[in-house]
Amino acid sequence: MTSTLPNDNIRNFDDQITNKLISEIIRDRIKNAGKRFSANDNISDFINPGELEILEKEVASRVRDLLKSLVIDVENDHNTQETAERVSKMYLNEVFKGRYYEQPKVTSFPNDKNLDEIYTVGPITVRSACSHHLVPILGECWIGIKPGNKVIGLSKFARVADWVFSSPHIQEEAVMILADEIEKLC
């Protein structure tokens, strides 16, 4: 069986044996674990070292096919010759990084001062992508919290918000996921 992709280098050793795309291998791992892989799910636990780079090449190939289907000259137009690679990197490492990378490490500390008043952090600039149309969502959020037994540094709220919003979402779900993640930390 031959590869459906123009560049056989995007396959890793296991893939050469099974003749599956890396996206299929990762998807199978997730399914075999009985987990979901919805648009806003983090799937980093199912991606082995080196596979994100292979996935990036697979996605670039698919983006190139999309551009060709849109009748865009990706071979001769200097403006679009490397667009597929740039788009692939952008989606995997920026726009959707909340799917493919672990949550950033955030250290919480005991609330030794017994802080009991609401404090607010914001505005925090957030960007995401609508999971229905994959169009950008840009905005600001404020986080208000009454400390419990633990507290985290103010800058950590922005770090967690960036990670949560860096997945395809509908906005209402993103806000609920952010609240759940903050609750776990505090």
Report residues per predicted region.
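A domain-level signal for the structural core that forms small-molecule/cofactor-binding pockets
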Residues: 2-186
